[in-house]
Amino acid sequence: MDADASTITPEELDFIRQRALRRFDSIVPTAGREGTEIASDIFKGRTLAIYTSGGDSQGMNSAVRSITRMAIYCGCKVYLIYEGYEGMIEGGDFIKEATWNTVSDIIQQGGTIIGSARSSEFRTREGRLKAATNLINRGIGRLVCIGGDGSLTGANTFRLEWTDLVQELVKNQRVTAAAAKKIPYIQIVGLVGSIDNDFCGTDMTIGTDSALQRIISSIDAVVATAQSHQRAFVIEVMGRHCGYLALVAALASEADFCFIPEWPAPENWRDVLCDKLSQMRSEGQRLNIIIVAEGAIDRDGKAITAEDVKTAVKEKLKYDTRVTILGHVQRGGAPSAFDRLLGCRMGAEAVFALMEMTEESEPCVISIDGNVMVRVPLLKCVERTQMVQKAMADKDWTTAVMLRGRSFQRNLETYKLLTKMRTVEKDNLSEGHKFNVAVINVGAPAGGMNAAVRSYVRMALYHQCTVYGIEDSFEGLANGSFKQFKWSDVTNWAMNGGSFLGTQKSLPTEKTMPQLAAQLKKHNIQALLLVGGFEAYHSTIILAENREKYPEFCIPMCVIPCTISNNVPGTMVSLGSDTAINEICQMIDKIKQSATGTKRRVFIVETMGGYCGYLATLSALSSGADNAYIFEEPFTVQDLSDDVDVILSKMEVGAKRYLVVRNEWADKNLTTDFVQNLFDSEGKKNFTTRVNVLGHVQQGGSPTPFDRNMGTKLAARALEFLLIQLKENLTADNKVIAKSAHTATLLGLKGRKVVFTPVQDLKKETDFEHRLPSEQWWMALRPLLRVLARHRSTVESSAILESVEEESADSHMF
């Protein structure tokens, strides 16, 4: 037995451990209702209550709004329980019936408008008896709990005790038997609201993305002063015993060192840290950023604080070192577009999950898996979360990282590779070969473009490749504008928007292709990464289709979609679109605020996106807009006239403003000016109309953490894939000849997977005239937009969503 065990390699042991974890502790999701027809009043006469508990997080208000309005639309009576479990115990004015207007204009607010608290009394039986009394007296038997694992565990304990609690209340005449009979059991659906992202079973928790944005904006600000004085900064971030925020912030900010609980530092961490910082300075870097999770520890379980790190750097290297503890600023401020959208989607799904439950149903949590709304068992998720805590208590760090999920593992692996200064001669993917690889940007600039190039360059250097950047797109390629990269050349690229390589929209033509081929041959380019929008995708098709004529194009090629329009087939999300939606939401928030004090004003906001309505739809949903006009959903003058009636009816009941988002090419005749003129004419003295054309500001300044990290990880994945193809298509005389369709691919997110799709296969899914994919997942969100905004809608969806039965992969980019 011992002899057999000794033959197992660490890799095999790792595989066995992962397989066992998946087998015995897998969390099996159930498909949600998103994208299906939503009929009004289908749950008429039913009652539910919403409460937020534990620490607050940005995006909770979005969830409260979504649950309230979807439930009212479906015919339910909705109660809001103020101050969490404390309010449930106190009763009285702490439990109020909600109306449609109760949750108006809250989607952009941080925190939670219904308050949150940590209740010690609810942990006692008497506290739970009081809470049960208040719920029974109001006929509440369905609860939506928005909080962390502690709040959700408490809710489940309450559910399990319900029968005994009710019997005791009836026996002691605290409630009537008739009232108790109406609520024989309670059902619970959870939404995880936590900035820590420490809950197993969901890829993202509500508030995490906003916290990351706050952290990254703070680090970006610190970088400027650190460079000026050649300082080292130690940044402490929240997260309790989960290192997610610290790890992802380190990736997005290009931090030099990161301390997290799941990957403890060795005993000699002071020497390792100082050697790394010294090495970075010797490469010409003027500053150092070190990120410390508040729960950071060493291998012995001893805490590592920001002050410990500062002392080590100051004593050993004599650097001017400062500590910045971000604290509760990470919880504050307006929620990001991602968290607003997540709250909307999860909240709507929670209503359907709750209403479809029976007495035998187990409580569930609404989760996002890849880009799909699913329902997962609450108890299984809590159990898995507790397993992480146990693994860390047992100092089983490998298991702790595995239990955090594939995304966490991928983040950690990528961070380790991208922060290495010395590349390995052996055990790399090149396997002794010296490949020449190149990267080019094509199309309009977008957030995350530089992050992708940085990641590709450093991963290529790590794997012993010579890597070139091609400047100014195909014009630069034709002119031989090549730059050979060193490791330090791409320092601080991730935090910057635009394109440092330069990018243009021109495509390869019959006239330029001989020049392109000649330059590829001259520099012996053996693999090419294209980072860009629809032009990058179209260019790859052109190059692949001309391989017979130009052998120089017979190399592995890969496209990473990077465009704010999100109009490239083969992926659900493009790099840059998250940055753009956040920019739009921030501007809409200011536009809405400008109406404060004025009466009856209608705003028309025009977004970019070409013919694609992605930006218009998602920014409308994320900002609480009333409608979005897009090309994919044709509209007529009659539709606009009907909207005027909606505007008038809303203003008659107290609304002071109405906001419409219009995609720039939604209709060639019904232009933004036309819509304004029609509204002005029909509205007459009832309201005034103003137009805001947002323009190129939507391309963003600093990329969001989402776009930085998605660009980083997609480029790393693309380089690995290209190296595999290089080795597969290498001839005996060390030439690369790649002719198959599978060597010209697009790397995208499809449902819950990251997929390489041959670009020639995507042609049939493409409307080249309008530069659109034939199927767009986000059209499934259009019904939700109308329900949450109008309170009257007949909706149906033809959007196609991916099956949740597919095996999960590292499709989420955080």
From Swiss-Prot:
Its EC number is 2.7.1.11. Pathway: Carbohydrate degradation; glycolysis; D-glyceraldehyde 3-phosphate and glycerone phosphate from D-glucose: step 3/4. Beta-D-fructose 2,6-bisphosphate binds at residues 505, 563-567, 601, 608-610, 664, 690, 696-699, 771. Keywords: Allosteric enzyme, ATP-binding, Cytoplasm, Glycolysis, Kinase, Magnesium, Metal-binding, Nucleotide-binding, Transferase. ATP binds at G55, R118, S119, G148, D149, G150, S151. GO terms for cellular component: 6-phosphofructokinase complex. One of its GO terms (molecular function) is fructose-6-phosphate binding. Residues 421-435 are annotated as: Interdomain linker. Substrate binds at S194, I195, D196, R231, M238, G239, R240, E294, R322, H328, V329, Q330, R331. It is found in: Cytoplasm. Residues 436-814 are annotated as: C-terminal regulatory PFK domain 2. The active site is at D196. Residues 1-420 are annotated as: N-terminal catalytic PFK domain 1. Its cofactor is Mg(2+). One of its GO terms (biological process) is fructose 6-phosphate metabolic process. Mg(2+) binds at D149. HAMAP family: Phosphofructokinase_I_E (MF_03184). NCBIfam families: 6PF1K_euk (TIGR02478). Belongs to the phosphofructokinase type A (PFKA) family. ATP-dependent PFK group I subfamily. Eukaryotic two domain clade 'E' sub-subfamily. Catalyzes the phosphorylation of D-fructose 6-phosphate to fructose 1,6-bisphosphate by ATP, the first committing step of glycolysis. Homotetramer. This is ATP-dependent 6-phosphofructokinase 1. The lineage of its organism: Eukaryota, Metazoa, Ecdysozoa, Nematoda, Chromadorea. The gene is pfk-1.1.
